[in-house]
């Protein structure tokens, strides 16, 4: 899935997602895209689920780019474990998404098919998104 091969540190701080995206807010590769409208932590499973729904809708036509990658680890302690005794083990990997970030891009398909595919992908994501196009 979408996890890094190697990291400098195994566990990250939780942190906050503040402000708007400083980069990655314009279409770079495709003609159509899905833009985040609110801050969120996207898991690698959610990104993979959205990617699958896009590829099923497009049916091997066009090209898809995924512009979000999971760099941050999230740790969790097991059930019925008391507080303390160190930080828990890594549970999942997440991508911290700021408002304005382009998540997916599509090219080589019609406007209607791209809108349908990205709307299905949007339903898999836990935040509000907007369909963007370089034509509009």
From Swiss-Prot:
Keywords: Ribonucleoprotein, Ribosomal protein, RNA-binding, rRNA-binding, tRNA-binding
Pfam family, one: Ribosomal_L16
Lineage: Bacteria, Pseudomonadati, Pseudomonadota, Alphaproteobacteria, Rickettsiales
GO biological process terms, semicolon-separated: translation
Similarity remark: Belongs to the universal ribosomal protein uL16 family.
Function statement: Binds 23S rRNA and is also seen to make contacts with the A and possibly P site tRNAs.
Gene Ontology cellular component annotations, sorted alphabetically: cytosolic large ribosomal subunit
Family annotation (Gene3D superfamilies): Ribosomal protein L10e/L16 (3.90.1170.10)
Highest taxon of the lineage: Bacteria
Self-association state and partner proteins as the record states: Part of the 50S ribosomal subunit.
InterPro entries linked: Ribosomal_uL16, Ribosomal_uL16_bact-type, Ribosomal_uL16_CS, Ribosomal_uL16_dom, Ribosomal_uL16_sf
Keyword match rRNA-binding: yes
Protein name (database record): Large ribosomal subunit protein uL16
Gene expressing this chain: rplP
SUPFAM superfamilies, A to Z: Ribosomal protein L16p/L10e
GO molecular function, one term: structural constituent of ribosome
Coiled-coil region(s): none
């Amino acid at each position: 899935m979408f996890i890094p091969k190697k990291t400098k540190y195994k566990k990250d701080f939780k942190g906050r997602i503040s402000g708007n995206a400083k980069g990655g807010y314009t279409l770079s590769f495709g003609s159509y895209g899905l833009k985040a409208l609110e801050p969120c932590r996207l898991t690698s499973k959610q990104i993979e689920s959205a990617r699958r729904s896009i590829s099923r809708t497009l049916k091997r036509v066009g090209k898809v780019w995924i512009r979000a990658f999971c760099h941050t680890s999230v740790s969790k302690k097991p059930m019925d474990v008391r507080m303390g005794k160190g930080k828990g083990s890594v549970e999942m990997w997440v991508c911290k998404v700021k408002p304005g970030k382009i998540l997916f891009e599509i090219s080589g398909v019609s406007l209607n098919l791209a809108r349908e595919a990205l709307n299905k992908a949007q339903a898999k994501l836990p935040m509000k998104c907007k369909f963007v196009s370089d034509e509009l």
